[in-house]
Amino acid sequence: MKKNSREVAAEIIYHWIESESFPDRQLAEVKDDRAFVTELVYGIVRRKLALEYIEQKFIPRRPEDFILAALHVGVYQLCFMDNVEEFAAVHET
């Protein structure tokens, strides 16, 4: 089954969280919807501290890394991407 763009971005972010290696190599392998995935990944990298600040207001302790990656994808879309509808950010992530 084909992964959606948000799932691909979450996997790349998960790898970045786990390995601390910059995600450019994984982004180079993305074929479908590359611009959207790139915006998500680089935006999350750029706004990591802001995302963590927002998330810690609602989550008392740090979730597991794969959940944190998905959370970053959803929160980034809701807070920093004007061209993404809220229902899409929540439902698809």
Where are these regions (language model features)?
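Class I Rossmann-like S-adenosyl-L-methionine
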Residues: 1-93
